[in-house]
């Protein structure tokens, strides 16, 4: 009995917790041909103990979450300009992390490894080590080493884990099984889904061709070069010099990411983005009409009403932030909560084949994607792009009409 059992309810999330909890080290994590982290089991080492299966989302029956109206939702921004400018939205993830480190918590979060060009979960013991957690990383993270460290070394320590809902679900399951949940604070994000690593790899080839570089000191997935809110802008720096800033519109990576065609299969009907049963706090951008004119950055902080730890932690950081409480209708309806994406299986196969073909570039893949869209969809995107190129106040006004 292990994670290769076929009685599944869902697809693999690539959380990698199965490998971290395996007492026989019978599970290794590899990128599959489509660019997703997957477990590989050594049948000679596996003793069918079932621990891996006990933390796996594939076999979990997730009940419908009925307490949405009880959740505590806040629009929040750090008072510190340095924190806000160095983060993706309002800096609340960084503020919460700083508070937890100061309380003696180890903090687990995602950093971008500029040598390997991958996102990696690491364990931070100091404030300085946690600074690299700042900023969104819109690719899968290699979590195994950090999660293994939690399982082997830190179950009796105070630990805070920042991750996607599927990461937090798996950790929460294991901690409750071991009766160690009280030692932990779990914070997840409003998650759109994770794209294939093959998209990011081919995108970097495209960027390298523009910059004539192969590595960078700093990679930002969502720069505020044009302000917060309307634009997804990648930026690469080296030696303090900005070498690449993607355009406001038609960026190759974000075109494929937000097409939703190349997400991890578990993301299409993910139940975990629509529940708070495993997490203490959920954070993200505060989308919606309330802050359309804000260019600085506003975070959405959703505190689990049933989590005393979550409520206490938010109270402790209130002196470092500006905040305002909102009903769920102002914010959660603009997130991925409750969404189910359509799987375009044939197009998905063709786009993966294009990404795998060394004779083709990511520009070819994007061109093929748009050729697959209807005339109506292409015209709609052109209209959206036209609006985004207008002055920021005009963009905010037009969005407010929708």
Indicate where each model-derived feature is located.
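Iron-sulfur cluster-binding cysteine motifs and their immediate structural context
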Residues: 17-40, 50-68, 280-281
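Gly/Ser/Thr-rich loops at beta-strand to alpha-helix junctions
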Residues: 87-91, 114, 161-171, 193-195
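Conserved nucleotide-cofactor-binding alpha/beta core module
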Residues: 137-174, 178-186
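Long, compositionally biased charged/polar accessory segments in the mid-to-C-terminal portions
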Residues: 103-106, 209-402
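Flanking helices and flexible, charged tails adjoining ferredoxin-like Fe-S electron-transfer domains
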Residues: 1-2, 44-155, 329-349, 353-358, ...
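Local cysteine-cluster metal-coordination motifs and their immediate loop/turn environment
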Residues: 10-25, 47-59, 164-170, 263-275
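Ferredoxin-like iron-sulfur electron-transfer modules
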Residues: 1-16, 26-48, 77, 247-255
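Short, flexible loop segments at boundaries between secondary-structure elements
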Residues: 182-206
């Amino acid at each position: 009995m292990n994670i290769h059992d076929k009685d599944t309810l869902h697809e693999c999330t690539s959380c990698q917790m199965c490998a971290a909890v395996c007492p026989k080290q019978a599970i290794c994590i590899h990128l599959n041909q489509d660019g997703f982290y997957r477990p590989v089991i050594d049948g000679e080492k596996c003793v069918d103990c079932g621990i891996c299966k006990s933390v796996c989302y594939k076999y979990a029956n997730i009940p419908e979450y009925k307490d949405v109206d009880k959740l505590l939702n806040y629009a929040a921004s750090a008072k510190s300009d340095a924190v806000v400018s160095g983060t993706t939205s309002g800096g609340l993830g960084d503020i919460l992390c700083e508070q937890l480190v100061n309380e003696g918590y180890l903090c687990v979060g995602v950093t971008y490894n500029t040598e390997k060009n991958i996102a990696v979960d690491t364990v931070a013991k100091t404030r300085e080590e946690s600074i690299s957690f700042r900023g969104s990383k819109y690719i899968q993270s290699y979590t195994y080493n950090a999660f293994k460290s939690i399982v082997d070394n830190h179950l009796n320590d105070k630990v805070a884990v920042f991750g996607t809902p599927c990461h937090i679900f798996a950790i929460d399951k294991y901690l409750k099984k071991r009766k160690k949940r009280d030692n932990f604070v779990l914070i997840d994000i409003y998650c759109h889904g994770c794209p294939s690593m093959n998209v990011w790899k081919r995108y970097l080839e495209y960027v390298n061709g523009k910059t004539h570089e192969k590595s960078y000191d700093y990679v930002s997935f969502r720069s505020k070069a044009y302000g917060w809110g309307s634009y997804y802008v990648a930026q690469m720096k080296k030696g303090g010099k900005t070498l690449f800033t993607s355009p406001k519109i038609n960026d190759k990576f974000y075109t494929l990411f937000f097409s939703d065609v190349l997400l991890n299969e578990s993301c299409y009907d993910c139940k975990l983005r629509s529940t708070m049963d495993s997490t203490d706090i959920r954070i993200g951008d505060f989308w919606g009409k309330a802050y359309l004119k804000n260019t600085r950055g506003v975070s959405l902080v959703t505190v689990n009403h049933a989590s005393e730890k979550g409520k206490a932690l938010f109270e402790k950081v209130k002196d470092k932030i500006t905040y305002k409480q909102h009903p769920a209708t102002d914010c959660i309806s603009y997130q991925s909560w409750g969404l189910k994406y359509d799987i375009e299986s044939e197009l998905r196969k063709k786009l993966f084949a294009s990404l795998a073909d060394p004779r083709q570039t990511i520009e070819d893949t994007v061109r093929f994607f748009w050729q697959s869209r209807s005339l109506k969809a292409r015209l709609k995107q052109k209209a959206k792009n036209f609006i985004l190129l207008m002055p920021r106040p005009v963009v905010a006004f037009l969005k407010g009409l929708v």
